UniProtKB/Swiss-Prot annotation:
One of its GO terms (molecular function) is structural constituent of ribosome. This is Small ribosomal subunit protein uS3. Belongs to the universal ribosomal protein uS3 family. It comes from Bacillus cereus (strain ATCC 14579 / DSM 31 / CCUG 7414 / JCM 2152 / NBRC 15305 / NCIMB 9373 / NCTC 2599 / NRRL B-3711). Residues 38-106 form the KH type-2 domain. One of its GO terms (cellular component) is cytosolic small ribosomal subunit.
């Protein structure tokens, strides 16, 4: 059976950048686990704040954390109280000085993680898996997606035998490296157990700007 590689990992270094940007020789494993802890803590603490991505940069004894969210107001809190409490908690967790930046995700319907969380939330509220998928597909296409594919797998509708059902619209060219494809895998906790939710969103092609610039210089 043909298996699919993670579309984000395949495009890192081609059209996507790393989400952790730092260099280490001896402490690599320690810092990697620290990154995982930071991301897990943020995702649990800001579960309802529509966090799309957490980027981490390091310099000496300082950690710069950039949180991409569709609800910046909830993350920052009244007068910045929430973000300050989060910063103190991360300082304690890492033992380093943590600086937090908040960036707003303008189009949540074109972000695979947020779309996946939307489907998962609906499944947890006993909405039909077919309806949940079709609804987010329509919204993504209206928001300007070139193509979208969703898949829900597990004990669908409480069935005894687990299965997977997927829906798609438009095109999702997984082999085209210049295609900007966002991907996410999310879990939904239902009364019948966990359901897996996968989302692929094709947002258009990313043109190789570096090559163009060099060509123009040559002319």
């Amino acid at each position: 059976m043909g298996q699919k590689v993670n579309p984000i990992g395949l495009r890192v270094g081609v059209i996507r950048d790393w989400e952790s940007r730092w260099f280490a020789e001896k402490d690599y494993a320690t810092l990697l686990h620290e990154d995982i802890k930071i991301r897990e803590y943020i995702n649990v603490r800001l579960k309802d704040s529509a966090v799309a991505k957490v980027e981490i940069e390091r310099a000496a004894n300082r950690v710069n954390v950039t949180i991409h969210t569709a609800k910046p107001g909830m993350v920052i809190g009244k007068g910045g109280t929430e973000v300050e409490a989060l910063r103190k908690a991360l300082n304690q967790l890492t033992g380093k000085r943590v600086h937090i930046n908040i960036l707003e995700v303008k189009r949540a319907d074109l972000n695979a993680k947020l779309v996946g969380e939307n489907i998962a939330r609906q499944l947890e509220n006993r909405v039909s898996f077919r309806r949940a998928q079709k609804q987010v597909i329509q919204r993504a296409m209206r928001a300007g997606a070139k193509g979208i594919k969703t898949q829900v797998s597990g004990r669908l509708g409480g069935a005894d035998i687990a299965r997977a059902e997927s829906y798609s619209e438009g095109t999702v060219p997984l082999h085209t490296l210049r295609a900007d494809i966002d991907y996410a895998a999310v879990e939904a906790d239902t009364t019948y157990g966990k359901l897996g939710v996968k989302v692929w969103i094709y947002r258009g092609e990313v043109l190789p700007t570096k090559k163009k610039a060099s060509e123009e210089g040559g002319k």
